[in-house]
From Swiss-Prot:
Keyword Secreted assigned: yes
Taxonomic superkingdom: Eukaryota
UniProt keyword list: Amidation, Neuropeptide, Secreted
Family to which the UniProt record says this protein belongs: Belongs to the FARP (FMRFamide related peptide) family.
Lineage: Eukaryota, Metazoa, Ecdysozoa, Nematoda, Chromadorea
A GO cellular component annotation in the UniProt record: extracellular region
Keyword set includes Secreted: yes
Name the UniProt record assigns to this protein: FMRFamide-like neuropeptide AF7
Length: 8
């Protein structure tokens, strides 16, 4: 669970 924009 990192930044919202990194959801691959």
């Amino acid at each position: 669970a990192g930044p919202r924009f990194i959801r691959f």
